[in-house]
A protein has these predicted regions:
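Conserved GNAT acetyl-CoA-binding A-motif
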Residues: 49, 56-68
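A generic local structural motif
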Residues: 15-18, 51, 89
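Conserved acyl-donor/pantetheine-binding loop and adjacent beta-alpha core of acyl/acetyltransferases
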Residues: 6-32, 36, 40, 94
């Protein structure tokens, strides 16, 4: 196993505080993108995200939305490099006192 990701088409309640770019109609929500440590730095996360984007376009989705831990510099840099816009922050008090950055990339 090189990597994994979880995606859904349903928006979790904690995302409702974010002022999203695209309408909340048909969007992809990315959760838990991970690449095995032995395979990091080889472009696998980018490949996974490009695959999700392609599937989103094929399925007429408005955008891809996601969050990542604010202190995860690699993920934050990856999403910015791939054209995602940081739109705000949310908190998961049961996970961390630090915020999670929310990103969106319109597909149309």
């Amino acid at each position: 196993l090189i990597g994994c990701v979880s995606i859904t088409f349903e928006m979790d309640d904690f995302y409702k505080t974010i002022d999203w770019i695209s309408p909340t109609k048909k969007n992809i929500y990315v959760h838990r993108l991970a690449v095995h440590p032995n395979n990091q730095g080889q472009g696998h996360a980018k490949t996974i995200m490009n695959f999700i984007e392609k599937k989103g376009i094929e399925n007429f989705c408005e955008s891809i939305r996601l969050d990542t831990f604010s202190m995860n510099n690699k993920n934050n840099a990856l999403y910015t490099k791939l054209g995602y816009q940081k739109l705000g922050q949310i908190y998961f008090r049961d996970q961390s006192e630090m915020p999670f950055n929310c990103y969106e990339k319109p597909l149309k």
